[in-house]
Amino acid sequence: MPTSSVCGVKQTGCTMIKSYSKHWACLFPQHGPGRKHQRKIELAPWQEVIVREYPGEFARGLFHSDGWRGVNRVHRRLADGDHWYEYSRYQFSNKSADILRLCGEALDRLGVAWRFSRRDVISVARRGAVARLDEFVGPKY
């Protein structure tokens, strides 16, 4: 797109690229009118190739935009007193079934165990799965 201006902005841990053009919808067909969870989100063939080759980077982008990594604290009352258990987990939330499907497919390619904790939330809570996802996602800056 020779007529659109592009600029790069250095940020901690990444470089943010900005560009404004009315032709982005031609290159990225999933962008369109209406809410994303009310229309079909479908990757173009060239995007599918990239997502298949780089599922870790794709998952990182998804979790950095619509996900979080936190620590759950669970309280149990036992005969010998109260016990607290803590464990790390990831959650990814999105109203679009298509985006949730794409996220799940990327996690499957990475060998990360996941499940739906709600209709619109993907949960990664098993210790090994969280450790595996940590290799790709990392902290938000």
Predicted feature residues:
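Internal intein/HINT superfamily modules and their associated LAGLIDADG
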Residues: M1-Y141
